[in-house]
Amino acid sequence: MPKGMCLKSDGFASNIYDPASDFTLHHFCAEKGIEYSDAGLPVRLDTFSAYGLAFKERKVPELEDKMVTCLERLPNGFRLGLDSGESFTARRVVLAVGITHFEHVPADLATLPPEFLTHSFRHHDLEPFRGRNVVVIGGGSSATDLAGLLHEVGADVQLISRRTALKFHGKPEVGKTRSLWQRIWRPQTGIGPGWRLRFCADAPMLFHHLPENLRLEAVRRILGPSGGWFAKDKVIGKVPLLLGCTVQRAEVENGRVRLHLRGLDGSTHDVRTEHVIAATGYKVDLNRLKFLSSEIRSQLKIVNGAPVLSSGFESSMPGLYFAGITAANSFGPVMRFAFGAGFAARTITRVVAKSVAKKSGSSSEPVRHELHEVKVPEPRQKAGAASGS
């Protein structure tokens, strides 16, 4: 993700979960002398990344940093293969693979060669785009953040979105006491204000018991594309916007990309650029997890690309659990955020501990565990695509 980017979540909602809650982002920033506020001060990506590494060293120093290349089913569990050639077995596996594998690029753009098209996730250093003409496609936080940062490094950037207007979060009112009526009417949560978000943030288990069609529709509609409040001033009035347009076709002509666009009124026109960045979000599709054996992928019960999960985050394959964005269809949009990790961790730990105790015949027997960082190979990409060259 781009250097200089900020998290959309507030400081109080950007903690990594641990039962004691004694090493929050606030604690980390205080130790390092980094400015912090529960709300109203954006959390920089580099600050959050440093916090994550410090959390690992302090809380789980025994975590193994290994690349998992295959996961196969066995009669009594699973076999995991590592890129080092090592392998080991486990009765239970929890997959929390994040968003890396689920980059979504619209079909009308996907035909472009990788030297002309990249996904926003692939970019960290934007300096290679200084002085170049770039088009960013999208209307959410990735698109607005990226467009603003590209403008700051000196790129000639334009933002194109099918939406007729960009949405931005409102800036939190820091230091101002909210009235009782305001707190009742629009309660604050770790993923935004309002009763719908309060339900999603505080009651993921109740969300899980909703009918499937309601859950899927809620995940699709709630928390739609919107930029962080801090990105608005970096984009509006500074980055040229082309709104209400969709890409009908994309092709390369004379070393530049030609985008064929259609407006809501049916009008058509073309835009030419050196490079296109698709800030078009992520779409869960377990078939993209190539380290999963074909047997596992074919036997998992899947709806809309995501695993169907029990109330304990267990998939239809006993012993295989999913957390993070892959659990959103089952437990709601809060699973996309660090704020939802606490619920997932507590639930999975309780279910696994109960299962182990049941098999051992004693609820008092301690649970033995091994920690392995679930690192999996990223989708292959041709050289030069990440740098935009």
Explain the meaning of each model-derived region.
Residues 2-34, 188-208:
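Flavin (FAD/FMN) cofactor-binding and adjacent substrate-gating region
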Residues 37-141, 145-389:
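Flavin (primarily FAD) cofactor-binding/catalytic cores of flavoenzymes
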